[in-house]
Design a protein with these regions (language model features):
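Domain-level signature for soluble enzymes in the chorismate/prephenate branch of the shikimate pathway
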Residues: 1-381
Length: 381
């Protein structure tokens, strides 16, 4: 057979496969009906294991692993379709609930607003807020929770908080507070972070014994700190550490903060750009009490809890794969008061209102114990 004949044979096989696939997916509705009548869950692990083992044993040895992969994917798509059908029978699907909850705006993201930030003048959160809003009216709070409370109580319309760094990882406290306050993300920003060693005018590097800054900044500058034998002390905020050094009577202390803090607090930039990586970015999010969705929103954040059993997270990820949804980020956090149980945060490359997102929301009921929609938004680069 020449290549043209081989391709013609493959086309015929693919047509047969397609027809069989459609027939298999169509029968998923009948499976769902039977499971409803019998009071059975969509996911039957014992049946699935038996089926996969049986199919693998019937496949030629060289195709055993591929057979399991193929049919596991088919089963995942079938379960997603079964769950979608069951949700439709309930009268309102998860995606419909998300649409009903979210407030879609036809107007662009606001240029000015009252915004809560953690820290004091010169904080990176302030710099981020000024990039996210043209004319923000900023109120400062000492803690991340203070920012959350200001938004909850209506003192500020939005809050701006750091959520992850390219070097030091996630800001876990912010993830925990998002779940605690049930707030929503309406915008995000990737901000280039350049850390500087700030001292009182005239101080030499050899005189510095102790450096103060936020824990994330200390982690991002670990190489410099260790290389110079400095003792690092955590402080609530980078700008607050600069203010503290400026007001201190000690001359052997320094702060790690933004260059703008030097001018604000009368300090000197002793060493610029001391972060370990030049590719040092922090991602900030704008939080709101309402799940506002502004035009152009193309990123979606979810929180899911699963059963505390082997394979529980895999079954969720399986649905993303089956529906061809790109997972940008996955973060796990322990559930307070529940030993060795976790909640999972997902960032998806998936616009609000898209069929892919709706299909996902309507198909994960059976593989998660709880589900929270954190919002759909645009990330500013």
């Amino acid at each position: 057979m020449d290549l043209a004949d081989i391709r013609q044979t493959i086309d015929g096989i693919d047509t047969t496969l397609l027809n069989s696939f459609v027939e298999r997916m169509d029968i998923a509705t009948e499976v769902a009906k039977s499971k409803i009548e019998m009071g059975k869950a969509v996911f039957d692990p014992a049946r699935e294991r038996f089926k996969l083992n049986n199919l693998a044993s019937r496949a030629p040895g060289r195709y055993e692993a591929q057979t399991i992969t193929l049919f596991r994917l088919l089963m995942s798509m079938s379960k997603a379709e079964q769950q979608r059908y069951i949700n439709e029978l309930k009268g309102i699907t998860v995606s419909q609930k998300a649409h009903a909850t979210a407030v879609a705006f036809d107007t662009p993201f606001p240029q000015t607003a009252t915004v809560a930030c953690q820290g004091v003048e010169g904080a990176y959160s302030q710099i981020a807020a000024c990039k996210l809003f043209n004319v923000p009216d900023i109120a400062f709070f000492e803690t991340f929770e203070g920012v959350m409370r200001a938004v909850r109580d209506g003192f500020c319309e939005f809050g701006v908080l750091p959520i992850e760094n390219s070097t030091a990882g996630s800001v876990n406290a912010v993830y925990d507070l998002l779940a605690q306050f049930d707030f929503h993300i309406v915008r995000s920003l990737r901000l280039k972070i350049d850390h500087n060693l700030l001292v009182k005018p005239g101080t030499k590097l050899a005189e510095v014994r102790e450096v103060y800054s936020h824990g994330q900044a200390i982690a991002q500058c670990a190489g410099f700190i260790e290389g110079h034998g400095l003792h690092a002390t955590k402080y609530p905020n980078t700008a607050m550490s600069a203010e503290m050094v400026a007001n201190s009577e000690r001359t052997d202390v320094a702060a790690i903060a933004s260059r703008s803090c030097a001018a604000l607090y009368g300090l000197e930039v002793l060493e610029p750009n001391i972060q370990d990586s030049d590719n040092n970015y922090t991602r900030f999010v704008v939080i709101s009490r309402e799940p506002r969705v502004y035009p152009g929103a193309n990123r979606t954040s979810l929180m899911i809890t699963t059963a505390n059993e082997p394979g529980a997270l895999y079954r969720v990820l399986e649905r993303f794969y089956a529906l061809n949804i790109n997972l940008i980020k996955l973060e796990s956090r322990p559930i307070p008061g529940h030993d060795f149980e976790f909640m999972f945060y997902f960032d998806l490359d998936c616009p609000f209102g898209s069929k892919a997102l709706d299909d996902l929301l309507d198909s994960i009921d059976d593989v998660c114990e709880s589900f929270t929609y954190f919002g759909s938004y645009t990330e500013v680069l």
